[in-house]
Design a protein with these regions (language model features):
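Short beta-strand micro-motifs in enzyme catalytic cores
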Residues: 21-23, 41, 68, 96, ...
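A structural feature that tracks compact, well-ordered secondary-structure segments
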Residues: 129-162
Length: 181
């Protein structure tokens, strides 16, 4: 099917309440650039998942080095080795999670190693929506796992080092730019 809008994934055949079948761009539900058809209610939609899709393409920067995702007991103090240039510390009633450079983690710590970190370039207002969805959706479609860390200004995607090439391919195919490879 020829695309009627930016992504053929948004075009679906629908059947109206009167039984007429036609193609409809689902972006028309929230994007004013697309016409809203039909005037009658849709009673069946073949496969469309009602979701908001960000229409912005983003730039991600692959940071140097490998990272680890570590788990310590909930009551453990924050260790000194978790204070590198890039690190994230999250405490919950169940655990203390630390994301940091793989080189900083001492032996004997429960962790998963071999992660690469992609930083979302720029600063984003906390009220912006669809940013992570536009980045994670192509990875989910490609069956690629990730771990996300957010800060006040931006987000970081951690992906397995063995999947980095596939992640870059999925993101660039979706229209995003990946630098620092």
């Amino acid at each position: 099917m020829n695309s009627l809008c930016k992504s053929c994934a948004n075009v679906r055949e629908v059947v109206s309440g009167t039984g007429s079948a036609f193609l409809l761009c689902q972006l028309s539900k929230f994007d004013k650039r697309f016409p809203k058809y039909p005037p009658q209610p849709v009673v069946r939609c073949d496969g469309y998942e009602d979701e908001i899709i960000a229409t912005t393409n983003y730039t991600l920067i692959v940071l140097p080095g490998s990272f680890s995702i570590c788990r310590l007991d909930a009551e453990a103090p924050v260790p000194e080795w978790a204070s590198g240039e890039i690190s994230s510390i999250t405490r919950t009633p169940d655990e203390l999670s630390i994301v940091c450079s793989q080189d900083d983690v001492p032996d004997g710590i429960r962790c998963e190693t071999g992660w690469r970190c992609l930083r979302l370039a720029g600063q984003f207002d906390l009220s912006e929506f669809g940013v992570l969805a536009s980045l994670t959706k192509p990875l989910a479609k490609a069956k690629l796992s990730l771990f996300v860390v957010g800060t006040f200004d931006t987000d970081y995607l951690l992906v397995k080092n063995t999947e980095l090439d596939s992640v870059v391919q999925a993101l660039t195919t979706a229209g995003h730019t990946v630098q620092g490879i």
